[in-house]
Amino acid sequence: MSKNIFITGTGTDVGKTYVTGLILKKFKEQGRKAAYYKAAMSGNERRTDGTLIPGDALHVRNVSGIGQPLEDMCPYIYETAVSPHLAAQMEGNPVDLDCVLEHFDRLCREYEYVTAEGSGGILCPLRFDGQKIQLEDFIQARNLGCLIVADAGLGTINAAVLTAEYMKSRGIQARGIIFNHYEKGNPLHEDNRRMCESMTGLEIVACVREGDTDLDMPFDLLESLYTEGEMK
């Protein structure tokens, strides 16, 4: 059975996909069989044949060098750049939680490590019609631990603490925070690091600078954050 983790963020465009690509690259460099998974992906472009390109999955594969087929990375792909629940209302093909879990479980049987990435922040809805499906439904169904990606700049204390506290209230285990767009020596970024650790009780396990092509984090530490979840 694989070891897994879920990558969430303090909001949209904080760099979850960028950081996830660097994480998968680390596993690839260590010779580990690692997979990427995203339940639902919106804001994708079309190929000349009309099919949708899973943009985040393609980015992760290009950055990391993993050989996982794109079609194995995401079961729900939408064109409109909105939350998956709204994209499905506009385009059809709403998310089915059983399908999401079955796809994830298959990857868990085939790979040593599975890194799942969320859409937007922790409260992003996957479906909101006759059925209501949140990201946390997927996380809780497989008892996944989480890493929080946060921007290192202004406003991150509030965003990181609210995210961590919500996860705690829902029984979701946060294993640490990764700062993105971090500038060493920047007084604001350094203070944000101290304050986020103090106010959330979580460690900033890595800081990613603009343009980094590698994750500055010992592999043993990264690997220790992954745990065996529950698979049906």
Language model feature labels by segment:
Residues E165-K232:
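C-terminal lobe/tail of nucleotide-utilizing enzymes
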Residues L24-K25, L135-F138, N158-S169:
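Histidine-anchored nucleotide/phosphate-binding helix
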Residues N4, Y18-P94, D98, H103-R106:
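N-terminal phosphate/diphosphate-binding loop that engages ATP/GTP or pyrophosphate donors
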Residues V100, F104-Q131:
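Switch II (G3) loop of P-loop NTPases
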Residues I7:
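Hydrophobic anchor at the beta1->P-loop junction of P-loop NTPases
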Residues F128-E136, V161-A164, H189-R194:
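Charged helix-capping and loop-helix junction motifs
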Residues F128-A152:
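Inter-motif core of Ras-like GTPase G domains
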Residues V14-G15:
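Conserved glycine(s) of the Walker
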